[in-house]
């Protein structure tokens, strides 16, 4: 078992005036899109803001963030008529992941008798060079009901010249509280003594059979595989290699419990944007299954992340095989020494992120600047 090093507890940052935020999210990857939008909305509310979250599919919130929701945070269906809009527009409108806000909302913004809201396009997370160049750039609307208005690009990222990532103000305190009961969590999930707990949250990686074969034949690791529900569970259950491992199939859980799983495990294989950030904050060895794109544009995005991470050769090779950039047979053999090297790498990256102003603080300051 690897030690778990909690983040340092921090004090609350500067409180901004209370604003009303309208966040729009069209779901593509149900867990990642919903996860990022919910964490953003919830942390804005935690810092004194009021948020309306507009979604075309909020079904995942039933288990990811079950009610009661925090006071000041409300969830709404995708509006298609003016009657579904609030009587008073909010102060800030956020298009998450480049989604287009509804035409009725654009019309309402254009016809607003008062100053229009700050309009922000919250983009996908990336470590690629263009993020620093495009962060905070304006984009003037040239046609349609909102012609003449300006929206602003806000790019999450990994460097001080970007919008950074979501980090809750109480994250360090939560991790320190969990550290005292981490052994109990592991025991309750079938992880004994010095077992190597491996969490699996993925799509359908071609190298999954190779990973399972490794874990079966790795007595030095004493692996215990914890499999998240959905596509990861279906992929594992379809493979005969999994049977000797006796995987534990987890149930859907709220976000705080997902975080605790990452903190409890010794290796986290995660997918998408939200769980990548959570795995970095966990500070444990991690492997990212990036969302695949048909033109393989995700290959450059993955390599840019690995460059920022300063990934050692074994971690880079594992990512390449796990993401189909190289043959599944090239998947490096996991060893305790390798995991310790990966842990040091992730913790160094986490330390770098922790020195930056977090995404919520930055987007609040940006909105105040543009109002």
What are these regions (language model features)?
Residues 24-148, 230:
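Active-site and donor-binding regions of nucleotide-sugar-utilizing enzymes
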Residues 23-34, 201-206, 267:
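Short, glycine-rich nucleotide/cofactor-binding loops
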Residues 221-251:
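Catalytic donor nucleotide-activated moiety binding site of glycosyltransferases and closely related
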Residues 285-327:
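Nucleotide-sugar donor-binding patch of glycosyltransferase catalytic domains
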Residues 123-208:
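A nucleotide-sugar donor-handling region in carbohydrate enzymes
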């Amino acid at each position: 078992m690897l030690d778990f090093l909690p983040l340092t507890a921090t004090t609350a940052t500067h409180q901004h005036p209370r604003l009303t935020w309208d966040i729009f999210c069209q779901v593509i990857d149900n867990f990642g899109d919903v996860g990022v939008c919910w964490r953003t909305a919830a942390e804005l509310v935690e810092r004194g803001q009021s948020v309306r979250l507009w979604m075309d599919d909020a079904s995942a919130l039933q288990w990811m963030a079950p009610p009661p929701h925090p006071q000041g945070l409300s969830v709404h269906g995708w509006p298609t008529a003016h009657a579904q809009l609030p009587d008073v527009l909010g102060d800030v409108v956020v298009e998450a992941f480049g989604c287009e806000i509804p035409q009725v909302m654009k019309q309402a913004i254009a016809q607003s008798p008062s100053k229009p809201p700050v309009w922000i396009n919250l983009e996908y997370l990336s470590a690629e060079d263009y993020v620093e160049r495009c962060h905070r750039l304006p984009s003037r609307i040239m046609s349609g009901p909102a012609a003449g208005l300006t929206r602003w690009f806000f790019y999450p990222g990994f460097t001080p010249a970007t919008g950074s990532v979501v980090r809750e103000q109480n994250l360090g305190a939560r991790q320190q509280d969990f550290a005292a009961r981490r052994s109990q969590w592991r025991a309750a999930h079938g992880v004994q003594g010095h077992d190597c707990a491996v969490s699996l949250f993925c799509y359908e990686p071609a190298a999954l059979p190779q990973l399972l074969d490794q874990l079966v034949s790795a007595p030095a690791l004493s692996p215990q595989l914890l499999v998240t529900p959905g596509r990861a569970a279906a992929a594992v259950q379809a493979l005969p290699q999994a049977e000797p491992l006796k995987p534990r199939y987890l149930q859907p859980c709220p976000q705080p419990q997902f975080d605790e799983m990452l903190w409890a495990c010794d290796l986290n294989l995660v997918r998408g944007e939200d769980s990548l950030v959570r795995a970095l904050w966990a500070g444990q060895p991690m492997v990212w299954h990036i969302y695949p794109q048909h033109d393989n544009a995700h290959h450059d995005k993955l390599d840019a992340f690995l460059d920022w991470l300063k990934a050692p050769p074994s971690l880079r090779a594992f990512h390449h095989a796990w993401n189909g950039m190289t043959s599944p047979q090239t998947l490096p053999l996991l060893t305790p020494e390798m995991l310790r090297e990966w842990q040091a790498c992730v913790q160094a990256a986490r330390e770098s992120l922790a020195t930056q102003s977090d995404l919520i603080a930055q987007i609040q300051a940006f909105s105040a600047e543009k109002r």
